[in-house]
C-alpha cells in the first residue's frame, strides 16, 4: 500500500476512534490503532495527530473525560465550502451581523474585506464567531445585507 494511502487510512481510523468518545488517554488510542493493524503508531504520533486535528478532552455522556473532535470546533478544510461556515446573516440600521461556526469569523471577514468597497463593503470587525460589516459610501445597509446573502447563497 502506498504511503499516502496508508496515511489516509490511519487518519480515517483515528477520526473514527475519536468519534466514539471513549478514549481517555493517548495510550488507549495507540492500543486501539495497533489493534486495527497500524503497528508503527506510537504515543508521539498520536499526540501530534490530536494537535493537528484540534482534538480536545471533554466529558462524554457517561461524564468521563475523553478525547473528541467536536464538529463545531473542527478546522475548516479546503474541501469545506465557506458558505457552510455561515450560520446566520441579519442587519439593523447600522451594520450587517454575520454569525459563523466557532473560529470561522476571521476567515469569512477576510474574504469580505478582500471584496472591498466595489462590492459595498467599507470594512469588517470579526470576533470568534461573529462579524460586524458596515457598508461603503453610496450603499445602504440593506444593499450590503442582500449582497452578502447572495454571496453565501442564503435565503432572502
Curated annotation (Swiss-Prot):
Belongs to the ArgR family. The keyword Ribonucleoprotein does not apply. Regulates arginine biosynthesis genes. It is found in: Cytoplasm. Its main location: cytoplasm. Pathway: Amino-acid biosynthesis; L-arginine biosynthesis [regulation]. The keyword Secreted does not apply. This is Arginine repressor. Coiled coil: none annotated. It comes from Cronobacter sakazakii (strain ATCC BAA-894) (Enterobacter sakazakii). Keywords: Amino-acid biosynthesis, Arginine biosynthesis, Cytoplasm, DNA-binding, Repressor, Transcription, Transcription regulation. Pfam families: Arg_repressor (PF01316), Arg_repressor_C (PF02863). InterPro entries: Arg_repress, Arg_repress_C, Arg_repress_C_sf, Arg_repress_DNA-bd, WH-like_DNA-bd_sf, WH_DNA-bd_sf. It comes from the Bacteria. One of its GO terms (biological process) is L-arginine biosynthetic process. One of its GO terms (cellular component) is cytoplasm. The gene is argR. GO terms for molecular function: arginine binding; DNA binding; DNA-binding transcription factor activity.
Amino acid at each position: 500500500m502506498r504511503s499516502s494511502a496508508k496515511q489516509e487510512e490511519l487518519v480515517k481510523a483515528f477520526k473514527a476512534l475519536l468519534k466514539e468518545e471513549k478514549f481517555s488517554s493517548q495510550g488507549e488510542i495507540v492500543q486501539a490503532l495497533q489493534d486495527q493493524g497500524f503497528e508503527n503508531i506510537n504515543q508521539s504520533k498520536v499526540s501530534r495527530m490530536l494537535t493537528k486535528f484540534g482534538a480536545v478532552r471533554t466529558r462524554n455522556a457517561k461524564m468521563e473525560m475523553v478525547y473528541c473532535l467536536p464538529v463545531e470546533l473542527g478546522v475548516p478544510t479546503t474541501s469545506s465550502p465557506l458558505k457552510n461556515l455561515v450560520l446566520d446573516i441579519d442587519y439593523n440600521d447600522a451594520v450587517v451581523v454575520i454569525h459563523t461556526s466557532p473560529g470561522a469569523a476571521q476567515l469569512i471577514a477576510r474574504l469580505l474585506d478582500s471584496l472591498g468597497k466595489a462590492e459595498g463593503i467599507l470594512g469588517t470587525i470579526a470576533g470568534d464567531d461573529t462579524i460586524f460589516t458596515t457598508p461603503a459610501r453610496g450603499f445602504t445597509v440593506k444593499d450590503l445585507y442582500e449582497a452578502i446573502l447572495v454571496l453565501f447563497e442564503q435565503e432572502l
